[in-house]
Amino acid sequence: MIAKTVAILALAGSAAAYAPTMSLSANRRELVQGAAAAAVVAPMLRPTGASAKDAQLRAPVVTIFDARGCKDHANKEYTDPKAGNAENDECCVKVQMTPIKVADDAAALVLKECLSELKGKK
């Protein structure tokens, strides 16, 4: 959006800088042309809202698996070479984007509590 705005302003600026003018006074035709150009550029200069919201309301969930000292069975899942350090070989971290679901009644309760705390601080 910013690049588009800069390009339009640069184009308008270069057109204004090299416009052939016979006199310094602006006539009616030039005023109408300037107003038309401003009307075209004005909608492009409006601020736009952020579009970064995740539609599924997902958040990263970190799960830590720690099997240090576990002697119940031999691990057969991992077949690559081991790190050589027993502590690192028996630990795993999993990060997964998971949809977060919040019930409407829970959200209303949190909102009510926050508003009551804000009103109490006056």
From Swiss-Prot:
One GO cellular component term noted in the UniProt record for this chain: phycobilisome
InterPro entries in the cross-refs: Globular_prot_asu/bsu (IPR011070), Phycoerythr-like_a_sf (IPR037011), Phycoerythr_a (IPR004228)
Annotated protein name in UniProt: Phycocyanin PC645 alpha-2 subunit
Record's function text: Light-harvesting photosynthetic tetrapyrrole chromophore-protein from the phycobiliprotein complex.
Protein's cellular compartments: Plastid, Chloroplast thylakoid membrane
Membrane topology recorded in Swiss-Prot or TrEMBL: Peripheral membrane protein
Primary localization: plastid
The UniProt record lists the keyword Thylakoid: yes
Domain of life: Eukaryota
Record-listed (2R,3E)-phycocyanobilin 2 binding positions: R68
Known partners and oligomeric status: Heterotetramer of 2 different alpha chains and 2 identical beta chains which form 2 alpha-beta heterodimers within the heterotetramer.
Any one GO BP annotation for this protein: photosynthesis
Residues annotated to bind (2R,3E)-phycocyanobilin 1: D54
Family: Belongs to the phycoerythrin family.
Other notes: The light-harvesting system in Cryptophytes contains phycobiliprotein complexes. Unusually they are composed of either phycoerythrin (CPE) or phycocyanin (CPC) but never allophycocyanin (APC), with only one type of biliprotein being present in any one species. Unlike cyanobacteria or red algae these proteins are not arranged into higher-order phycobilisome complexes, and they are found in the thylakoid lumen.
Pfam family of the protein (one): Phycoerythr_ab
Residues reported in the UniProt entry to bind mesobiliverdin: C70, K76, E77, C92
Keywords recorded for this protein, A-Z: Bile pigment, Chloroplast, Chromophore, Electron transport, Membrane, Photosynthesis, Plastid, Thylakoid, Transport
Changes after translation: Contains two phycocyanobilin chromophores and one mesobiliverdin chromophore with binding mediated by both the alpha and beta subunits.
